[in-house]
């Protein structure tokens, strides 16, 4: 039985990876171009007029945040659009009636989102080498933060895909929730620059912890304790996973 589950999992993974690789011009190139513009405008043009941040140039400071931003948006978008597309075309019904556990379905879609997020993250990292020298303080924290964040936002994208009723619903969360939280998550600034009230308010933003942990992996500096960073990641991953599992298990909005 486990062999059959493994075959099902690999099949979903293969389908999801083939899906975004087949249209790589739409899925991989745009985020690379967008991040390149960020590097040029904020890093070179504006960054040259801004002083050092915690002993690093402004460009070095924002690179980890921009990489994380690309991972978050692409992991989320991949699963949200793919799962809703399967639901819209009623392909998901075939998967639900097949002898495939809900855990396998979730792992398959999340695996595809993680793959796209990491792939884009690697491409953006490669582009950043044209602007700043490569520096890693801890590979363990870089890899751990990157993978956990990609898993979390893949689950969030799956949740969006379950609730979405139209294709417009797929863009609502990224536009009104994800983008503001990312920009206010410390990508372009350190929390220490904010007044105490806004520092405290920023700690309610979960993306702050992810960017802080990822920046520590590269530069060895962080705005929040690492234990808190990984605690927040694990709690959100478990919560989102259980919600997704419950909704798919009950077929909420999936069965006609």
Swiss-Prot record:
Where on the tree of life does the source sit, at the highest rank?
A: Bacteria
Q: Name one GO molecular function term.
A: ABC-type transporter activity
Q: Which residues lie on this side of the membrane: Periplasmic?
A: 1-22, 74-94, 138, 191-223
Question: What are the ABC transmembrane type-2 domain coordinates in residue numbering?
Answer: 22-251
Pfam families referenced in this protein's UniProt entry, alphabetically = ABC2_membrane
**InterPro entries assigned:** ABC-2_transport_permease (IPR052522), ABC2_TM (IPR013525), ABC2_TM_bact-type (IPR047817), ABC_2_transport (IPR000412)
Transmembrane segments in this chain: where? 23-43, 53-73, 95-115, 117-137, 139-159, 170-190, 224-244
Coarsely, its chief localization is membrane
User: Which controlled-vocabulary keywords does the entry list?
Assistant: Cell inner membrane, Cell membrane, Membrane, Transmembrane, Transmembrane helix, Transport
Protein localization: Cell inner membrane
Query: Which membrane topology describes this protein?
Result: Multi-pass membrane protein
Q: Cytoplasmic compartment: which residues?
A: 44-52, 116, 160-169, 245-256
Question: What is one GO cellular-component annotation here?
Answer: plasma membrane
Would you identify the family this protein belongs to, as annotated? Belongs to the ABC-2 integral membrane protein family.
- Database matches in NCBIfam families: PRK15066.1
The name on file for this protein is Inner membrane transport permease YadH
**From which organism does this entry originate?**
Escherichia coli (strain K12)
